[in-house]
């Protein structure tokens, strides 16, 4: 299994899936869903990205956990993507199904998962979502594997009533995350630099930027972040529902390589 190397500040590209069978907006052509995902994944690989994460972005309105009828399709697409690229692959099962995410990653040879609410409580458009750290560790013990858990702190599209510093510490010390993710308020929105700096100061594990990465802020974020999850700016014309733009993806790779001295 190929893993992420946080010493090299990995660029992780988001493969936003089209609506899956069983989701409200599924269009009826499953092969198109698979082909779209593979194309975006290959574009990230060609551009020089360090990893990809597959998420069921098209399945909104989301449920807190994945409906059973969606899970097989998600697994099939993830396996098809894994077969076509050699990059480390992650899974994010929206809105917060850490058990399914881990199970799919384990089944398809994934390297990591993203969990939106690992600890604490988030008030979201799906209602109140509670952390799932203990349930996740139970599954890890049952099926094994060395899949990393990257956990959001004060995840986007949600309201939080905890102190950010305490939330970081809880995610690291009590949730046992392998890395934490700092995001803006909504998909594609830039993060608070103050939050990133604070997270780096109090966290003993890698800190990733999870939204709003673009050429204008990349150099500044690079000073502090241990990795980047990118999904909006790299799309054609910066529109999230468009395919990944090879040229835009290459721009970030060139910037990263320059800053790394490669």
Curated annotation (Swiss-Prot):
Cross-referenced InterPro entries: Aldolase_TIM, BtpA, RibuloseP-bd_barrel
Assigned protein family: Belongs to the BtpA family.
Protein name: Uncharacterized protein PF0860
């Amino acid at each position: 299994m190929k893993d992420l190397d946080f010493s090299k500040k990995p660029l992780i590209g988001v493969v936003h899936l089209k609506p899956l069978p069983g989701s409200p907006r599924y269009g009826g052509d499953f092969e198109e869903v698979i082909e779209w995902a593979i194309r975006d994944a290959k574009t990230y690989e060609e551009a020089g990205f360090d990893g990809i994460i597959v998420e069921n972005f098209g399945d909104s309105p989301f449920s807190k956990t994945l409906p059973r009828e969606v899970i097989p399709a998600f697994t099939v697409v993830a396996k098809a993507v894994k077969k076509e690229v050699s990059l480390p692959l992650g899974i994010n099962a929206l809105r917060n199904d850490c058990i399914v995410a881990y199970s799919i990653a384990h089944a398809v040879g994934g390297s990591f998962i993203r969990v939106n609410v690992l600890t604490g409580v988030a008030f979201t458009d799906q209602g109140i979502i509670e952390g799932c750290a203990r349930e996740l560790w139970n599954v890890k013990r049952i099926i094994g594997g060395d899949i990393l858990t990257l956990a959001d702190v004060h995840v986007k599209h949600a309201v939080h009533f905890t102190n950010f510093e305490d939330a970081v510490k809880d995610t690291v010390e009590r949730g046992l995350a392998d890395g934490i993710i700092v995001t803006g308020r909504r998909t594609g929105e830039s993060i608070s630099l103050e939050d990133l700096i604070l997270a780096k100061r109090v966290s003993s594990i890698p800190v990733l930027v999870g939204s709003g990465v673009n050429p204008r802020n990349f150099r500044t974020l690079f000073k502090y972040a241990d990795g980047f999850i990118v999904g909006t700016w790299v799309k054609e014309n910066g529109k999230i529902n468009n395919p990944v733009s090879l040229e835009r993806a290459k721009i970030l790779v060139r910037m990263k390589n320059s800053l790394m001295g490669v």
